């Protein structure tokens, strides 16, 4: 098979994965990244010796990530992982707490402190989550999603039990209410809808596969942060011969010979777009998933804040009602990541870096309304910062007077990096079959493919890598057909 020319537009994790795998097959690959650095949303910053990720902060499905590096011939570049136990600490407004562990018995013990009956709920919930994983999760991830017919055929191969598990799925909140009596654990389960930028009151119970994945495969920290993983991917693709252009905003058009890509004015046989399909397709009326507002903090000295912690607001349903009405939450849930709790390389001695985030509504895509939303953020940011500080100090009072802001990221910043409306995942996966309506990898013209968190199979580092693998697989098949 002769070497074909492939353009990859976007240097996020999905684009890097696709570029590397296509180069490994012998294709001549050129990657165009509009920003000054690779990684897409998976960026990291260094501030006075602190290293802080500004995008994803954890890793699941480690075997998938290792497998990708193995396919790239780059296991020697892969940073080591540390599995976290406990995985995350949860705080509630009534002073109660809950800790998630990989060890189900320890998690059940923590749940029983809220109410003894919740011990049984932990076991029954995770059993049903595992069934959903087998019924829908595994077939969803084993091949590119090309339509419900192919997906249901993969489900059917798992037997009638899998078919029934898929048919009875309700919302994620309804599933949580079925197994848990306390609002605490219903909130805990509901939070996993936000991994795709959705509301637990409108997202499918299929999202229960996320806590199952964390329980079954663990929550991991990459030494040096996710930014170190991006650096390793960048080294891998360059070593494979991929030509990388940074600070280059590429455009493409379909022509008889293939695709002309500007500004290089060269013709390519195939194009992989590592950008949200909604932005590329300009669907301004498409509802968007949530965005986020991030503070990067420096703390004087070390802190008792665990690696991952969540501080819930008091009324979870109201919080999502406000967010999807385009408003900031009055009492937001706050997530904090303290990577130096596990990895001393992330901060110098005597100092700590914290990543702190709240959910935020995506900005409108229509130009006039988008301009107003950007102006609104200029006046809203200070209020959101105060809410985040108040909640952080309420649950970790030793932080008072020791914290300094060293950076922030708003939906405006995400939009500037190409996220439609600043939405983290673009497509909104609400509805019973929401996850299966996600934009597909195959584009609308021959030889065009998409990779990234906005397409199948979804967001998060391993799934974005998988989208890159699928895009490379489909592009290679196309190139063989036209060779």
Q: Where are the regions that the model predicts?
A:
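N-terminal glycine-rich phosphate/pyrophosphate-binding loop and immediately adjacent elements
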Residues: 2-137, 427
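Active-site/ligand-binding neighborhood in enzyme catalytic cores
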Residues: 130-240, 416-431
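A glycine-rich dinucleotide-binding beta-alpha-beta segment and adjacent secondary-structure elements
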Residues: 182-196, 331-335, 394-457
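A conserved beta-strand/loop element that lines the FAD pocket in flavoprotein oxidoreductases
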Residues: 237-250
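Mid-domain catalytic core of redox enzymes
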Residues: 248-348
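FAD-dependent oxidoreductase catalytic-site/capping-region signature
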Residues: 335, 341-425
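A conserved FAD-binding loop/helix module that cradles the flavin
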Residues: 453-475
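Active-site-proximal substrate-binding core of FAD-dependent oxidoreductases
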Residues: 477-483
């Amino acid at each position: 098979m002769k070497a074909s020319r492939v353009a990859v537009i976007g240097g996020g994790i999905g684009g890097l994965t696709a570029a590397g795998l296509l180069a490994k097959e012998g294709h001549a690959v050129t990657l165009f990244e509009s920003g000054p650095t690779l990684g897409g949303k998976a960026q990291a910053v260094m501030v006075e010796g602190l290293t802080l990720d500004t995008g994803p902060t954890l890793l699941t499905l480690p075997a998938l990530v290792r497998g990708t590096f193995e396919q790239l011939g780059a296991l020697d570049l892969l940073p080591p992982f540390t599995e976290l136990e406990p995985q995350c600490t949860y705080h509630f407004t009534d002073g109660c707490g809950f800790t998630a562990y990989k060890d189900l018995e320890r998690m059940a013990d923590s749940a029983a402190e809220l109410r003894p009956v919740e011990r049984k709920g932990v076991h029954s919930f995770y059993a049903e989550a595992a069934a959903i994983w087998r019924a829908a999760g595994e077939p969803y991830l084993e091949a590119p999603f090309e339509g419900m017919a192919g997906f249901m055929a993969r489900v059917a191969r798992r037997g009638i039990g899998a078919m029934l598990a898929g048919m009875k799925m309700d919302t994620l909140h309804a599933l949580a209410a079925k197994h848990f009596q306390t609002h605490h654990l219903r909130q805990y389960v509901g939070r996993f809808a936000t991994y795709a930028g959705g509301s637990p009151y409108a997202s499918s119970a299929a999202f229960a596969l996320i806590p199952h994945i964390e329980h079954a495969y663990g929550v991991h920290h990459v030494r040096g942060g996710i930014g170190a993983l991006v650096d390793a991917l960048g080294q891998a693709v360059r070593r494979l011969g991929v030509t990388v252009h940074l600070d280059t905003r590429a455009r493409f058009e379909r022509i008889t010979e293939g695709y002309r890509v500007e500004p290089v004015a060269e013709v390519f046989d195939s194009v992989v777009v590592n950008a949200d399909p909604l932005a590329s397709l300009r669907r301004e009326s498409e509802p968007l998933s949530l965005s986020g507002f991030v503070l990067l903090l420096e703390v004087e000295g070390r802190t008792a804040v665990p690696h991952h912690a969540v501080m819930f607001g008091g009324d979870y349903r109201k919080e999502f009602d406000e967010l999807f009405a385009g408003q900031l939450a009055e009492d937001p849930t706050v997530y904090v990541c303290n990577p130096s709790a596990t990895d001393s390389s992330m901060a110098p001695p005597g100092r700590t870096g914290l990543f702190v985030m709240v959910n935020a509504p995506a900005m409108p895509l229509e130009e006039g309304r988008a301009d107003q939303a950007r102006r609104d953020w200029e006046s809203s940011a200070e209020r959101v910062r105060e809410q985040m500080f108040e909640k952080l100090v309420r649950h970790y009072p030793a932080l008072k007077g020791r914290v300094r802001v060293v950076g922030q990221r708003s939906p405006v910043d995400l939009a500037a990096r190409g996220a439609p409306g600043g939405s983290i995942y673009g497509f909104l996966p609400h509805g019973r079959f929401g996850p299966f309506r996600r934009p597909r990898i195959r584009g609308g013209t021959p030889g065009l493919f998409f990779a990234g968190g906005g397409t199948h199979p979804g967001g998060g580092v391993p799934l974005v890598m998988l989208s890159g693998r699928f895009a490379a697989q489909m592009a290679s098949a196309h190139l063989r057909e036209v060779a």
